[in-house]
Amino acid sequence: MSEITLPEYQSIAAELQSASLAVTPAELHGLLVGMLSGGLAINDQTWQPILFDYTNDGMGWPTTALAFAQTVFKVTANELTGSSMELSLLLPDESGEEGLFALADSLSDFVNHFISGLGLAGIALNNASDDAKEALADLEEIAKLGIDEDDDFGEQAQLLEQVIEHVKACVLTIHAEFGARPESSESKPTIH
């Protein structure tokens, strides 16, 4: 059985644009990761009406765009609930200076929409652990970051990679506290 992976960034971007949906792949992924990390159920379709309301004034998505979103949701749910502690981010993979700017902007979009997704899932942060509060505070700061045109691009690319890894750690920290878990496949003992 082959493992399902996130769709390629450019193909999903083209599909979202052709469907006239004003959301980027990074924003879509951030929103879904945020909703899942906020405790949204992983075994039903309750995420779709929330997505439609947030991105398309409550209107459903065209079939192909929705299929991309379903794939992103499924891959993300599997990663977040798996034992590997790995998280893939749906970010552009372009080279050069323009690619670095696009990557930084997309990371900011992902983080902003992750935070929105947490809100849409309705988590109560007042009872959150210090670790979760710190992770969220870090994400709020990361959302404001950008690339300085006057600094060394090679150094900034390395720093951005470190920031991306920190974003993943923050997301996993928040999901560990608030995220939904898959229902156990182990059957409970029958008492006679």
From Swiss-Prot:
Signal peptide interval: none
Pfam families, per the entry: UPF0149
Domain of life: Bacteria
GO cellular component, one term: cytosol
InterPro entries: YgfB-like, YgfB-like_sf
Recorded family membership: Belongs to the UPF0149 family.
PANTHER family named in the record: UPF0149 PROTEIN YGFB
NCBIfam families cross-referenced by the UniProt entry: PRK01736.1 (NF002477)
Protein name (database record): UPF0149 protein VP2588
Higher taxonomy: Bacteria, Pseudomonadati, Pseudomonadota, Gammaproteobacteria, Vibrionales
